[in-house]
Regions:
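Hydrophobic transmembrane alpha-helices and their immediate loop junctions
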Residues: 1-208
Length: 208
């Protein structure tokens, strides 16, 4: 019988609360609630598919860049199944975005469109090919399948570093012209830090 994947120890990093505080300062509470809801459903999507495949989670840690899962058995899955786990969160967000948009055409227009937008933004953000986001993991898995793990990790690391540096430059530019641009800059430098921290890690280190 597989271990229960939801019996993991849950930790919340200070960076998560800092991001929530910064978002609350520059955004309406409705937007903050929409983003937090979308993020929660995103992570539940990952966990639901992991449970389906019998993957146990020992530790669940929330950070400003998402959730870090200590799931040693995840690396034992075939590339295809691990890719499904990786993209499960984004799939949930896209499904919810479509559902909310359709609902917004009939009722609660403003609320539905705000929450649908949050799901779309979170999905797009997570598809960026930057470690530790889902897009980078999906890219690494695809490249590893065709070219081998070593090549996949090297190429993903190079792409991740280039993209995170470009995002930091864009974040600095936006922070000079937009009231909320510094929040984007904060997230961009957080991604750069995450990329540098995880460069060189072997297959099996998971952030989803």
């Amino acid at each position: 019988m597989p271990q229960r994947p939801f019996s993991a120890a849950v930790r919340v990093n200070a960076s998560f609360w800092l991001l929530v505080l910064l978002a609350a300062i520059v955004s309406p509470l409705t937007v903050v609630a929409a983003i937090l809801t979308a993020a929660a459903l995103h992570e539940l999507g990952h966990l639901a598919v992991m449970r389906y495949y019998g993957v146990s989670v020992k530790r669940f840690r929330l950070t400003a860049l998402g959730a870090e899962l200590d799931a040693p058995t995840l690396a034992r899955l075939p590339y295809g199944r691990e890719l499904i786990v990786t993209l499960a969160g984004v799939t949930v967000n896209l499904f919810c975005a479509v559902l909310l948009a359709l609902l917004g055409l009939r009722t609660w227009r403003e609320w539905c469109f705000v929450f649908a937008g949050a799901h779309l933004v979170l999905a797009a953000f997570n598809l960026l090919p930057v470690v530790p986001l889902d897009g980078a993991r999906a890219l690494c898995l695809a490249l590893s399948f065709f070219l081998g793990p070593a090549t996949g990790e090297r190429v993903t690391a190079a792409v991740s570093l280039a993209c995170s540096l470009a995002l930091c430059a864009l974040g600095l530019k936006l922070s000079l012209g937009l009231h909320s641009g510094w929040l984007f800059a904060f997230a961009s430098f957080g991604l750069l830090w995450g990329t540098l921290r995880q460069l060189g890690l072997a297959r099996g280190a998971k952030s989803v």
